[in-house]
Structure formats: structure tokens, C-alpha cells
Design a protein with these regions (language model features):
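Membrane-embedded alpha-helical bundles that constitute the cytochrome b-like, heme-associated redox core
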Residues: 1-227
Length: 227
């Protein structure tokens, strides 16, 4: 008789709330960005007419029609505001799960992770052969996810500062005024875009099993990242 082979064990990785909020946020955020580009087209600069303004390489830019949502300013604003509330709700649901389950401990970047982040950087740059030891998330992932959560909070706050500059004058002032809040809100979005591109690249290049786990919640065997 031939030697029996058993399939690798099924390992649970992502709770359904994590998967739901992840994919729902992808869809809603795409709509927010597309409608935001249409809103920006209405006045493609950061400053009052005839006054000083924040310099941006996107001054006067016209984004491709396929990348914009809403058709015109009013339509884009309707989409943007309608999608903002689900985005906030999904964010709060995700944060609530992290706190209730204790998963925040495995996700939060702390000072003790600095050395591990340096070693992971060396590994990705092929300056280190062995994969550094890690837990559920490696230190660079912790740094990225902690930063994204912080940026998400800033995106919401700057968004409200632009949405209600009179009613929330204290918040608008905190960010340097209406045009400054617009400026920070706009650039936070591009940081999200950059993070998304890098995130997708690393998923396929380093941890393809993580995509299966984010779809089904589980994976068989070990991640390529040795977690």
C-alpha cells in the first residue's frame, strides 16, 4: 500500500466581520474616490479665487471621464455624501470588532516592532535571506495598517471640516481653514491609493494565500510568510 497523504490542516484567519468590512470598504471607497474626483473637477485648485493657494501638481487637472462618478458637481456631491455614512459605519464596525475580540493587539504597531520592521524591509529588499519570525501580521503590516486606520480617521475629520465649515468651524479651523482642509483631504486620498496599489502587489507577490483567506476566512497549510 502506498503511503497515505493527508491534506494540510485548515487554519482560520479572518472573522466574517473583518471580511465583510474589508470588501464593503473597497467598494464604498472606490465610489468615494470617483465622486471626489468629480467634485474636484468643479474647482481644480486649492485656494480662494484671486488669493493665495496651496500648490498642487493636480492644479487644473482633468481626470478621465471613466474615473469620475456623478456626472456633474451636484450629482457627485450626492454620491459622496451618500457613501460617506456607510464608510464610517463599516469603519466603526471594524474597530469595534478589533476592540471586542482583542485583535487590536496583533495589529497595532508599537515601538518594540521597529526592529522587526527594519528586518522585514531587508527581507523584501533581498538583503536578508531568511524570513523574519512574526505573528499573525509582520511588523511592516502592523505599521501600514495602523497608519491606514489613522489616515482613515483624518479622512473622515477633514471630510466633515469641508462638508460643514460653518457648523463645525472649530474643526475646519483646526485643519487650517476650508481650503487647507480640502488640501489635506485630497492628499490623504492619494495616500490611500498608493497604499492600495502596494497592498495588492504584495498580496500577489508575497502572500497569495492571504487573498484566499480574505475571501473564505481560512487557508490550508502555512502562509508563505511563515506566520
Amino acid at each position: 500500500m502506498g503511503a497515505s497523504t493527508s491534506s494540510p490542516p485548515l487554519v482560520r484567519r479572518h472573522h466574517w466581520i473583518v471580511r465583510l468590512t474589508h470588501w464593503a470598504t473597497v467598494i464604498v471607497l472606490a465610489g468615494m474616490i470617483a465622486s471626489g474626483l468629480q467634485i474636484y473637477e468643479a474647482y481644480a485648485r486649492f485656494g480662494n479665487r484671486g488669493g493665495p493657494y496651496f500648490v498642487s501638481p493636480f492644479d487644473g487637472a482633468q481626470f478621465p471621464h471613466w474615473s469620475r462618478l456623478g456626472g456633474w458637481l451636484a450629482g457627485a456631491l450626492n454620491w459622496h455624501f451618500a457613501l460617506a455614512w456607510p464608510l464610517v459605519a463599516f469603519g466603526l464596525l471594524y474597530l469595534g470588532y478589533l476592540v471586542r475580540s482583542g485583535e487590536w493587539r496583533a495589529l497595532l504597531f508599537r515601538p518594540r516592532d521597529v526592529r522587526g520592521a527594519i528586518e522585514m524591509t531587508k527581507y523584501y529588499l533581498h538583503l536578508r535571506r531568511e524570513h523574519p519570525p512574526q505573528g499573525k501580521h509582520n511588523p511592516l503590516q502592523k505599521l501600514a495598517y495602523t497608519g491606514v486606520i489613522g489616515l482613515g480617521a483624518l479622512a473622515v475629520l477633514t471630510g466633515f471640516a469641508v462638508y460643514k465649515p460653518t457648523q463645525l468651524a472649530w474643526l475646519t479651523t483646526l485643519f487650517g481653514g476650508f481650503q487647507a482642509a480640502r488640501y489635506w483631504h485630497f492628499w490623504i486620498v492619494w495616500i490611500f491609493v498608493g497604499f492600495t496599489i502596494m497592498h495588492v502587489f504584495l498580496v500577489f507577490a508575497v502572500d497569495p494565500a492571504s487573498l484566499r483567506a480574505m475571501l473564505s476566512g481560512s487557508y490550508r497549510g502555512k502562509f508563505p510568510s511563515h506566520d
